[in-house]
Amino acid sequence: MKNLLSILFLFSFAHLIFGQNQDRNTFSSNTLYVGKSITVPEAYNTNKENYYDEISPKIFSLYIEQVNFPKITAKITGRGNQFSIEGIIDNDKITCLFNGKSDNGLDGMYELKIENDSIKGYWLANNQNSSEPVKKNIVLGKRTFLYNPQNMISEEFTGEIIDFEHPKNFKEKNSSQVIKYRVGTDIIYKINASTDVLTSEILKNMRKLDLEIIKNSILARHGFSFKDKTFMLYFSAESWYIPNSINVDADLTDIEKSNIVLLNQYIATANDVYKEM
């Protein structure tokens, strides 16, 4: 009987020790995860002016900086903002509770759980218009960021390049108001401003939206997080895009710096082409 009790004690002790170690290694330091947050259907408010913006997936990254069990520190980057958060790893659920405090639209409470190479959970985002937070589901995958100047915008979507975030009212001949959206061209698939030396001859007749996309493609390759919704949503569709910085100036190559200067000159004077959808 004593031997049986001794065995049970040793088994329980070993399970406690090794079980804790396994949980401690679940979240690893210096690990990057990238994914999107999606507002859960029951939190939709169809009466809000920004309803479609609220429900559209938002890409962001979570970088686990340090794990000092049970404490964990991480950095969240998204929507053109970046901030550090601290949390506690819950041994039982293998979850981590983050309480971000900021005014950048990413604050609230995060409850996350490791599943293999993914992080899943939810985010109770602070709501400026209500005391009730907005619940968003989160799915993040483990990624490694590597700058690649050859990354190009995918031609998978062969339709028109449309900026739905900046509509403009036009008065027609019959005095009615028509909403139109600025459109780009397929030139954005052909110019790589990270590798090609741009000239005035190339840029002088281009549309403003095309110029902006070509310029921001440079920043996207370096992991820049866009605050402008047009480009945040546009580059979110690219598998290579990993937002992990809010300032990439120090990372730009000489070609990129020179091209950005020239692109900015033409963006300042270029015209947009608008179309009714």
Predicted features along the sequence, with ranges:
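Amphipathic alpha-helical packing elements
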Residues: I202-P243
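Beta-sheet ligand-binding and adhesion/scaffold domains
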Residues: N21-Y63, K71-R79, F83-E172
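Charged, compositionally biased N-terminal leader segments and the immediate start
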Residues: P167-K190
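Mature, Sec-exported extracytoplasmic domains of Gram-positive
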Residues: K48-Y52, I114, Y189-N192, R207-K208, ...
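Compact alpha-helical subdomains of small soluble proteins
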Residues: F226, L233-M277
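Acidic/histidine-rich, surface-exposed loop or edge segments in extracytoplasmic proteins
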Residues: I188-S200, P243-I246
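Bacterial Sec-dependent N-terminal signal peptides
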Residues: M1-N25
